[in-house]
C-alpha cells in the first residue's frame, strides 16, 4: 500500500484499501463563522467604534464587510487603485510598473483575461460562500485534463516526450496494478491479507489497471487512439503502451498526486470574467466612500486614543485615528512602517518569509490547443522553468484565447524575476514549444507577465513561516502564534495567519477570526 501511495498518490492507495474494507472513515466538523449582527451593539455599547483597515485585499475587504454588518465605522486604506490585492485579473487596459522599472500595458482583446493571482476555488472553501452572498457568478475551472501533456527533460527513459495525461496514467496505473497483482499471487501479502482480502484486491486491480485475464497490463483504450474509432468496421487504432521499465524509470507519474490534494481535487470553480469580480462586489457592498485608494501607508502606531495611521495620497500626507486597526499588509513590509510595535512582534513578522511566483499570459489569435490537441482547459506540466502551461476555461471554440504560458514558483520563478517582459516571453515560448511544438510559437497577438516578488505593495506571492513543516500552513510556530493576538488595539490578518496560506479561503478565515475577537472585545465593554 505504501508503494501505491508513493507512485500514484493517496487516492490510489486509499482506493485499494477501500476495495478490501480497510479505508478509514472521514469525519468533518466545520466550524461556522457567526458574523456580527446589527443588534449586537445598539443600545448596549456606547460609541461608533471605528476601525481602520490597512489593505484592500481579501482579508481587508472581508473584515470591513463583516464589521459593517454590526454598524462599525470602517475605513479601508488601499495603496493600489483597485481592490483585491494579490487577487489580480489582467485584461485590456491593465497597466503596471514593476520594481524592475518596466511598465507594461495589457492589450488583450475585449473579454479576454487571465488571473495573475488566485485563479481557482476549491468547492470546500468559504470563498464560494462569499460568491453566493455577494452575487458573483461562478463557472467550472479545469484543474486537470486527460488531453494535456507531461514532458520532463533529462536523459531518463521517455524524457523530452510529450505524453498525454491519459496515456501516462493508463501505463502507470496499469503496471503498478500488474506488479501488485503479481505480489499478491506470489504470496508476498499473505501475512497481512486473508484469502477474501486478496480476492477483493485482485478484482480491484484488474479493473483499476485494466489488466488482462492473466493479470498483465498489455495496453488499454484508456491511453487514447492514434486513429479515432468511427463508423462501421472502423474500430480505431489504440496507441501502444510504453514499456514497464521506461514508465517506472521515466517518472511520468510524478505530477499525478496534484489532483488528489484536498484543495486541488475537482470540482474547482472560478468567477466568470476574472477572480477580481469578487473584490469589486466587496467594494460595492462596503461603499467606495469607505475605501481610499492610492493610500500608501507610511506609519501605524498605538496611541491613547486608539490607533493612528499615517499615509500619503498623491503626494499629500494624511492621517486617521480609529478605535482599532486591522493590518493586512504583507508581514515582511510592516517593519518598513513608522511604528511602535514591540521588538518581539517585529521579530515574529520577520519570520514570515516572502516567496516567488509569477505568470505570463499569451493571447493567441488561433485556439490551436482546441483544434489540434483537443485540449479544453487544464494544464500541461514539465520540470522546465515554466512549470506548467494553463489553458483557458472560457470562450471555448472561439477564434482566440489567453494561455498562461507559465505559472512557476520558487527557484523556477526566480529564473524569470530579473528578466524584462520580452525576455520572459522568449523563454516561455522556447520552453513551451518543447512541449507543444512549433505551433506554440505562432499566432501570438499580445502578452503580459508579472512576478509577485517584483510587484509593488506585495513583493511576495505568499508568506511561508521559517521552521514550519508545511509551506501552506502556519503549523503553530512561535512567531505565527504570537501574531494571532492583537498588539494593544492593532490586529493582524491575512492568509499568512491561517492554515490555508496562498488561498483566498485562508485570508477570509483569518479575517473572520479577527472580526470575531474584535467584536467580542467591544461587546465586553458594555
Language-model regions, residue ranges each:
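N-terminal glycine-rich phosphate/pyrophosphate-binding loop and immediately adjacent elements
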Residues: 36-178
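Active-site/ligand-binding neighborhood in enzyme catalytic cores
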Residues: 181-296, 304-306, 321, 337-338, ...
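N-terminal export leaders
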Residues: 1-17
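Conserved flavin/dinucleotide-binding core of flavoenzymes
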Residues: 3, 7, 21, 26-39, ...
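Short glycine/proline-rich turn/loop motifs
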Residues: 41-45, 105-113, 253-267, 406-415, ...
Amino acid at each position: 500500500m505504501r508503494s501505491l501511495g508513493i507512485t500514484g498518490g493517496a487516492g490510489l492507495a486509499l482506493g485499494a484499501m477501500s476495495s478490501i474494507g480497510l479505508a478509514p472513515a472521514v469525519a468533518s466538523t466545520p466550524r461556522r463563522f457567526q458574523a456580527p449582527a446589527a443588534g449586537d451593539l445598539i443600545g448596549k455599547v456606547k460609541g461608533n467604534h471605528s476601525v481602520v483597515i490597512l489593505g484592500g485585499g481579501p482579508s481587508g475587504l472581508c473584515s470591513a464587510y463583516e464589521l459593517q454588518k454590526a454598524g462599525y465605522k470602517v475605513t479601508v486604506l488601499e495603496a493600489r487603485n483597485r481592490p483585491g490585492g494579490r487577487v489580480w485579473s489582467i485584461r485590456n487596459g491593465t497597466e503596471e510598473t514593476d520594481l524592475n522599472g518596466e511598465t507594461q500595458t495589457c492589450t488583450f482583446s475585449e473579454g479576454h483575461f487571465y488571473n495573475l493571482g488566485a485563479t481557482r476555488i476549491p468547492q470546500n472553501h468559504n470563498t464560494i460562500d462569499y460568491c453566493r452572498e455577494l452575487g458573483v457568478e461562478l463557472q467550472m475551472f479545469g484543474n486537470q485534463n486527460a488531453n494535456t501533456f507531461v514532458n520532463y527533460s533529462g536523459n531518463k527513459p521517455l524524457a523530452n516526450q510529450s505524453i498525454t495525461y491519459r496515456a501516462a496514467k493508463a501505463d502507470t496505473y496499469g503496471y503498478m496494478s500488474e506488479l501488485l497483482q503479481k505480489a499478491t499471487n506470489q504470496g508476498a501479502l499473505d501475512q497481512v491479507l486473508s484469502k477474501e482480502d486478496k480476492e477483493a484486491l485482485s478484482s480491484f486491480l484488474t479493473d483499476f489497471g485494466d489488466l488482462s485475464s492473466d493479470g498483465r497490463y498489455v495496453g488499454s483504450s484508456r491511453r487514447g487512439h492514434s486513429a479515432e474509432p468511427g463508423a462501421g468496421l472502423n474500430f480505431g487504432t489504440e496507441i501502444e503502451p510504453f514499456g514497464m521499465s521506461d514508465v517506472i524509470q521515466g517518472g511520468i507519474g510524478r505530477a499525478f498526486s496534484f489532483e488528489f490534494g484536498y484543495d486541488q481535487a475537482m470540482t474547482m470553480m472560478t468567477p466568470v470574467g476574472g477572480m477580481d469580480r469578487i473584490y469589486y462586489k466587496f467594494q460595492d457592498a462596503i461603499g467606495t466612500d469607505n475605501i481610499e485608494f492610492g493610500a500608501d501607508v507610511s506609519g501605524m502606531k498605538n496611541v491613547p486614543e486608539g490607533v493612528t495611521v499615517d499615509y500619503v495620497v498623491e503626494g499629500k500626507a494624511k492621517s486617521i485615528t480609529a478605535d482599532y486597526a486591522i493590518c493586512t499588509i504583507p508581514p515582511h513590509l510592516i517593519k518598513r512602517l513608522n511604528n511602535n510595535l514591540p521588538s518581539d512582534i517585529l521579530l515574529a513578522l520577520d519570520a514570515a518569509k516572502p516567496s516567488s511566483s509569477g505568470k505570463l499570459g499569451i493571447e493567441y489569435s488561433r485556439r490551436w490547443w482546441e483544434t489540434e490537441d483537443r485540449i479544453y482547459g487544464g494544464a500541461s506540466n514539465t520540470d522546465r522553468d515554466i512549470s506548467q502551461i494553463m489553458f483557458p476555461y472560457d470562450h471555448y471554440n472561439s477564434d482566440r484565447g489567453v494561455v498562461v504560458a507559465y505559472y512557476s514558483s520558487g527557484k523556477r520563478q526566480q529564473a524569470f524575476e530579473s528578466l524584462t517582459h520580452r525576455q520572459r516571453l522568449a523563454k516561455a515560448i522556447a520552453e513551451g514549444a518543447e512541449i507543444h511544438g512549433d505551433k506554440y510559437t505562432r499566432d501570438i497577438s499580445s502578452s503580459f507577465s508579472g512576478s509577485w516578488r517584483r510587484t509593488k505593495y506585495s513583493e511576495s506571492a505568499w508568506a511561508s513561516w521559517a521552521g514550519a513543516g508545511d509551506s501552506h500552513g502556519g503549523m503553530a510556530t512561535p512567531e505565527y502564534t504570537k501574531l494571532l493576538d492583537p498588539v494593544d488595539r492593532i490586529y493582524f490578518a491575512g492568509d499568512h495567519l491561517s492554515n490555508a496560506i496562498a488561498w483566498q479561503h485562508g485570508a477570509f478565515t483569518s479575517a473572520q477570526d479577527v472580526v470575531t475577537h474584535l467584536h467580542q472585545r467591544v461587546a465586553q465593554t458594555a
